[in-house]
Amino acid sequence: AEASIKAYVSQDVEVTINTRKADKPQAEPEPVLPHVKNIVAVSSGKGGVGKSTVAANLAVSLAKMGYKVGLLDADIFGPSQPKMFHLEDFQPYGEMVDGKQMLIPAENYNIKMLSIGFFVKPDTAMLWRGAMASNALKQLIADAEWDDLDYFILDTPPGTSDIHLTLVQTIPIT
């Protein structure tokens, strides 16, 4: 490379070449939801257009067809799935699963479901910055005992936000 530069540009050119040692190949990270076949996100740039209703109806329809279904209410700032599934009074709890404390999803209509709405009072405003909301969402995904699922439905918040970025960076949406 140095000879070519001097031949075609000028002999007076000073060439400094820095090389970098190749990084060792890193092991492929473990998938976050290894027992889930399909991950479907229901989203829209606008609020109030029926995302939560579509997500709930999709989950119920798939469950009625015999599929194993999980639903995550990822709308951290306006969770509505607990009400739609008549689970407003559900109290989340954890159990030891394979030596790790895991959150156990609520279950209704043969659908496993988690929502941030289970952890906050309905009339309480969520004043979380992006990182806090994203970390809460990651925990609802990775630290829950979802078991084997055919479909994992994500009810996303309106717009594009840190939540959406977290979802696409954390799990392979089908």
PLM region spans:
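Phosphate-binding loop that captures ATP/GTP phosphates
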Residues: K68-D123, W128, S134
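Conserved acidic residues
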Residues: I111-K112, D150, T174
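Residue-level signature of catalytic and energy-coupling elements of molecular machines
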Residues: I5, V36, G47, D73, ...
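Walker A/P-loop phosphate-binding motif and the immediately C-terminal alpha-helix
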Residues: I39-D75
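Short glycine/serine/threonine-rich phosphate/pyrophosphate-binding segments
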Residues: G48-N57, P79-S80, T156-H164
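Extreme N-terminal, non-catalytic leader segments
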Residues: A1-S43, F90
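Phosphate-binding/switch loop-helix module in NTP-utilizing enzymes
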Residues: F118-T170
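Short glycine-/polar-rich loops that comprise or flank the Walker A/P-loop
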Residues: Y67, P172-T174
